[in-house]
Every structure is written in structure tokens, then in C-alpha cells.
Amino acid sequence: MKPILPLLLSALILFVTACSTTQPKSGGSWAGYAETGQASYYADKYENRKTANGELYKHNLNTAAHKKLPFGSNVRVTNVSNGKSVVVKINDRGPFVKGRIIDLSKSAFSSIGNTTSGAIKVKIEVIR
């Protein structure tokens, strides 16, 4: 029975490492990644608060939050209904509302849609 334990342990370690995945570490390796879904924008109360990467949120800068894209990634966000687009830099994590794929700064959102709508359908594409 004792000789089987090391064999089972080795098989388990091999299985676990074979099933693991790694995500790209830099924005460039995500280039071409695309996703379609709802975008919203930051409320005014978040002005001058720290983002997940330590920067201060400024509503007049073209920045955004995404759940998994690396910080510093440049992303083209296109409003599906009117074709307008804006390039933003990922510097925060979120959104944490079901169905939303990106949170935009207020100025970025305003450049492609009307803030009174609250959320719009967008396509996002990592450009670098």
C-alpha cells in the first residue's frame, strides 16, 4: 500500500498542473480581444477616489474598469447603436453589476452616448 501513495500523489500533482491556465500578463498579448455587452459610467461621487491600480479617478480622463484586462490596456469602446467610439485606458476593476462588461469615466461615456441613458450596448476591443 505504501508504494502506491507516492504514485497517486505524483499523478495528482501532474493532473493539477496540466489543468491550470495562465492569463496574458501584458496588454499586448490581449491585443484583438473583443467583447460585446453593456457599458455604464462612474457616478460623480467617485471623483478623486483611488482606482484598483492606485491612480485617482478623474471624470475628465478617458479611463475604464474591466474585470480581467491588464491595467494599462488601451481599449476601443464602440457604441453599437451609433458607431461612435472612444479609446480608454484600463486602470480599475469592475463593473460588478450583472450584464455589464465595462465601466467608463464620465467623459469617455459622454463622447459615445448620452449619460441620461445610464448604460449602453458597446463592443470593446483591446488595441494594445
Tell me what each language-model feature is:
Residues 2-6, 17-128:
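Secreted/periplasmic proteins
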